């Protein structure tokens, strides 16, 4: 046995330290955005107008996405002027290059309860709304029809099975949305599509920014979870539909 072979064998005898491994994994985990920094920038920049401005940005994200320049040329003159003014005011960008980049979608993801409630109210304006989802399953929860719902899936206060069911139910919309906005994905396999949104989804679900107790309370209020914390029938059906894709 060579010296290097011996070292490899001895390395394999190192005891696994679960705490150390989990610390490494957390340090290396996908981190797409920092909601606290985004909200701080919005509030400090916007002053008294930050809430109204932010709601406008979120509705834009829900209905048009991140393509500010392209979308501004295909809307009312007043809407275009307001959008471009907000882009300059808050430094909005169309593509997130760093954790500090502020895109319309990131603004929406940073404020998930308001965003998801707005999605349910604006459902007919969504790029992938009830007209699409109700062809897949009946009564698909409208709050799930947006990019912010992952931040509301709890990892505490409910069973692991409940977390898994909600992630699968939400993935049904994510699959449809990905294929809608990305032409290259329309012929892709379920696994390929899932891999395209897997990391951001898991990052949102596992984020500690939005408290789990607030997530559970909100989901119960919307009927997505029952009083006992069990997923609604609609969520269960949606999860099954995703598994069967």
UniProtKB/Swiss-Prot annotation:
It comes from the Viruses. The record marks 64, 67, 70, 95, 106, 184 as: RNA-binding. It is found in: Virion; Host cytoplasm; Host nucleus; Host endoplasmic reticulum-Golgi intermediate compartment. The keyword Cell inner membrane does not apply. InterPro entries: Capsid_Phlebovir/Tenuivir, Nucleocapsid_Phlebovirus. Pfam families: Tenui_N. RNA binds at residues 30, 67, 106, 186, 196. Its main location: virion. GO terms for molecular function: RNA binding. GO terms for cellular component: host cell endoplasmic reticulum-Golgi intermediate compartment; host cell Golgi apparatus; host cell nucleus; ribonucleoprotein complex; viral nucleocapsid. The keyword RNA-binding applies. Coiled coil: none annotated. Keywords: Capsid protein, Host cytoplasm, Host Golgi apparatus, Host nucleus, Ribonucleoprotein, RNA-binding, Viral nucleoprotein, Virion. Binds suramin, which inhibits the replication of SFTSV in vitro. Encapsidates the genomic RNA, protecting it from nucleases. Displays high affinity for single-stranded nucleic acid. The encapsidated genomic RNA is termed the nucleocapsid (NC) or ribonucleoprotein. The ribonucleoprotein has a non-helical structure. Serves as template for viral transcription and replication. After replication, the nucleocapsid is recruited to the host Golgi apparatus by glycoprotein Gn for packaging into virus particles. Belongs to the phlebovirus nucleocapsid protein family. Homodimer. Homohexamer; ring-shaped, necessary to form the nucleocapsid. Homopentamers; opened pentamers in solution. Binds to viral genomic RNA. Interacts with glycoprotein Gn; this interaction allows packaging of nucleocapsids into virions. The N-terminus is involved in homooligomerization. This is Nucleoprotein. It comes from Dabie bandavirus.
